[in-house]
Structures are given as C-alpha cells and as structure tokens.
Amino acid sequence: MGYSPPSPFKNVVEQQELQLQEPVSSRRLTGPVQFILGLLDCWKLEKKDAVYLLGFDETQSTCISEVFKGNEQLLGWDAKDRLSHLFAIRESLHYFFRDLETENDWLREPQPLLDGQIPMDLLLKGSIVDILLVREYIESMVGR
C-alpha cells in the first residue's frame, strides 16, 4: 500500500462553519460548496472572491451568499467545471509544496513561465482560460 498524503482540507469545513454569520449544518452544504469554502480558507481569500473563481459576476454575489448559507445549490456546468480545475490546482500545489504557507506565497508571486503574471491574479480574473493556464502550469511543475 502506497503513501497517502494527508488531506489538504482536514477540518476546514468545521472552521468555516464557525466563521459564517449564521450557523450552517455541514449536512446542508453540498460537497462543491464545502470544497470552495475550504479553498477560500486555504488560500486566505474572502467569500467575495468565490464569485470570480466560480465565474459569476458581481451582480450574483447575493446568490453566492445564499449558496454558502445552504439556502441555494451551486448549479451550472461552468461552475462545476471550474471547481474541478480548482480542485486539481489545489491538489497539485499540495503535492508539490506540502506546506500551505509556501503554497500561498507561490500563488502570490510573479511566475516567469506565466510571463511574469501572478497565479492568484489570473485565478481571480474569472476567466476559465486563465484557470486552465494556471492548472497546466502547475501540473507541468509536478510532472502530471
């Protein structure tokens, strides 16, 4: 049996529940919503950043708030595709760095092979093309 690294999101859901304005049972939150809340925590982002990561525009921030409260579900193939890519990015970064602080530093530093762009800036632009660019770059770093 091979080595299995610890989960990059251990206990994140419980931590996020404490930070929500009103208590939400994790049973009411779908897996994708739990994942995005965990990702925001890991990457030290605010809930408003989820709007861009998921491909919504600013006018839909109320909808995202309702999703985080468990009152609405995250619908649409685009958002689910983005979640899939974000999961792959997070998984590859965790595999490569094994340290959340180093991972966060890397995400916020200009990367020469991305033409000096900052990966987090690309992710927060809201473009699926930019998310894919960051994913491909990170996966090439880890040899996937």
Identify what each model region corresponds to.
Residues 1-144:
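Non-transmembrane "mature" sequence context
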